[in-house]
Amino acid sequence: MTLNLDEAKITAEVLTTALPYIQRFVDKIIVVKYGGNAMTDPALESSFARDIVLLKTVGMHPVVVHGGGPQVDNLLKELGRHSDRIDGMRVTDKDTMDIVEMVLGGNVNKSIVSLINKHGGCAIGLTGKDANLILAKKLMMEKIGVDGVAVPVDLGFVGDVVSVNKDVINMLIASDFIPVIAPLGVDEEGNTYNINADLVAGKVAEFLQAEKLMLLTNIKGVLGRDGEVVTGLTPKTVDSLIEDGTISGGMIPKIQCALDAVRSGVKSAVIVDGRVPHATLLEIFTNEGVGTLISRDLG
């Protein structure tokens, strides 16, 4: 085979450009929340798995937390069941919880593990129930009624994170595994809860004191007052954009997870456009990234 010198030079240039970033993040924990289009497009699924394997290969410690709402919706539809949502949260009765656990802890989790392993990784799948990984409690929610008075809303088996058993994850990391975590938790009575994957990822990053939290989404990032993507934000700036309504709707809980993680010691959090092939690598190995970075060190 004849060496194409021009192509070889380009490859060498790419590798040397990545070197400072590899050195910066070597032996650091990177928590990645995997969801959205990146989980439903085969090409994006493959690029994500290869990205995770590459991070591990060059000495970083990726930890994957995944969603799977569309997959749950599909099975509920096939079974002729309906699931209401309140402010984006799925109302989860006992039967629905069984289906959620089957989809997230079974099919979705094992598919991700299999794909990472196919590309040379050594992934291991977990739910929050394994080794009491995620201690949960029932999520208490209120809505403002027509009379302006807050009324409680019962979402069923929808949970909030109390704590994360970081020792289990650190043990897997030390043994060179890539943990892949389904967003299910268990309370002290043994009840299983469905938990928002962004929330789980943020709490996992917090308890591990990760170097970076990455939330893969179906949008380019946080949009500023001019409608353009804001590439960098401090916690103070985020608070201001929420107060004036620039950040609103479904972006608020997502960015709140990132904000809470940063305020709890995670070095930085980034909302990444998961529709971009190899978004994870582009975020780690380039200055520009592919989303909105939130860090106390900006400015």
Swiss-Prot record:
It holds the Pfam family AA_kinase. GO terms for molecular function: acetylglutamate kinase activity; ATP binding. SUPFAM superfamilies: Carbamate kinase-like. One of its GO terms (cellular component) is cytoplasm. Gene3D superfamilies: Acetylglutamate kinase-like. One of its GO terms (biological process) is arginine biosynthetic process via ornithine. Substrate binds at residues 68-69, 90, 194. This is Acetylglutamate kinase.
